Amino acid sequence: MGGPLSDVVVDDGRIAVVGGAGPGGEGAIEFDGGGELLLPGLVDAHAHLDKTLWGLPWRSHTGGPDLAGLIANERAARRHLPPVTERAGALLDACITHGVTTVRSHVDVDPDAGLGGVEGVLAAAEARRDQVTVEVVAFPQSGMLVEPGTAELMNAAVAAGCAAVGGLDPAGFDRDPVRHLDVVFGIAERHGCKVDIHLHDRGELGAWQIEAIIARTRALGLAGRVTVSHAFAVATVPDERFARIAAGLAEQRISLATVAPGRTEPLPLRRLRDAGVNVCLGQDGIRDLWSPYGNGDLMERAALLAWRSGFRGDDDIELALDTATFGGARALGIDGYGLDPGSPADLVLLPAATVAGR
């Protein structure tokens, strides 16, 4: 990716002309891009804005080694943190600085937090609505069926403004995948919202749940409105099973979200692309009670994804970038995303001649 120097004319917040445009009309404001690489605004398709400690004094990691331990540690500590609006806003500012113009954030909903996290993130987003678009997912971080009252709160969160309903390891954590998916897809059907389910379960258990999600998506006519986040099982299933799962994902336009995880096999981006499966990228939790890592720079995360995938060629590096741009836009259903006339003029300039050179 990278081409000849071109002029771009923006009118009323949208790209009007690309290439050979020359100077704008009377009153136009000219900005010299200095030959840098122009991209559409970056899309962070998997974040946890409510969890961040961004802007606070350094806190050493105290979470346990497994999912349950991490959840318990966070629930005990978060009540002593500054308001969500303050922390989420500080992290959004960092993301904006790095060229992120759209964020999908999962936000914890449970009997302790209630809808406070959702309200806090929505408020932080509203204060920055001219700079970034934030889509909130109601997320049952502490489990849904194992935490009585959470399902009702999830429904209320979507009614209060969440664009999507989430889920968490229907089998591995909630221990009842059928009921878990009944609740999640029931909320989606009731409110007409999107679905984005965290799925860490590996092996046959994870593969079976992905196929169950595909079946629910098909049955409810939700093609193009469902995402499976992490989907670790996809990276390790046998070839025949992979082909069947990938075909179902592609048919229903179900996206997979990755965060370039460090302790598990990365999603096979090339194989998924060749099968027609969309993959998007996020930064997950940034400097929070789960992990000390992250800084809001999605391009850095895309480079990490390329490195974890063993990519070296320009085409492969561009594939990693696609997860942070067009892949995210496809997952979130952003209309007109890109650099074509008529596209929203949410643009980023990078000091490079090509993506690989970045």
Predicted feature residues:
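Histidine/acidic residue-rich metal-binding segments in metalloenzymes
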Residues: 116-130, 146-227, 231-254, 264-281, ...
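His/Asp/Glu-enriched, well-ordered alpha-helical/loop segment
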Residues: 215-226, 270-352
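Histidine-centered catalytic micro-motifs
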Residues: 41-52, 107, 194-203
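N-terminal metal-binding scaffold of metallo-dependent hydrolase/deaminase domains
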Residues: 1-26, 355
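Active-site gating loops and adjacent loop-to-helix segments of metal-dependent hydrolytic enzymes
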Residues: 52-84, 164, 209-227, 245-250, ...
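Alpha-helical scaffold segments that flank or form the walls of functional sites
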Residues: 55-106, 112-129, 152-159
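Divalent metal-coordination and catalytic microenvironments
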Residues: 13, 35, 46, 99, ...
